[in-house]
């Protein structure tokens, strides 16, 4: 994030934490966007018109969270210089914003890892114990494998059941 221009979608508590980290990491410029303009934020329309050169976009808003998972806070097509997207939402695992980023070959990170990291630090604090940082990746990997599924589509008698039975044996 050093020397990058960052667009932050949302202006609540999570946005304030993101701003503090970006400032510590040497972010060149931070733009805060929300639905309605305030003294400290701009609107979606202003972001697209005046700040299309943002290199990193961070979604701290609930836009795109289940049950409104078909929403996204911004259209990445308006930001041709975007290099990375961070979406703090963890449900769904892949928000529409992250899906769009991946289709555009833009690096993207979702919110599940952050949620697990928060839980790790909460356990350490309340249990007065120290856990290895590697537990974060272990838990994220386990959760991802539990939440993902395989969908087989095809005409009748094309082998979906046979493939499903074979997959079930290998995956269980």
Feature annotation, model-predicted:
Residues 163:
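Hydrophobic positions on the alpha1 helix immediately C-terminal to the Walker A/P-loop
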Residues 3, 88-148:
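Adenosine-phosphate binding glycine-rich loop
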Residues 160:
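Conserved lysine of the Walker
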Residues 24-42:
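NAD(P)-binding Rossmann-fold cofactor-contacting core
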Residues 170-172:
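Post-Walker A helix-loop "phosphate-sensing" segment adjacent to the P-loop in P-loop NTPases
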Residues 1-23, 154-156:
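Glycine-rich adenosine-cofactor-binding loop
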Residues 40-109:
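Rossmann-like adenosine-cofactor binding region
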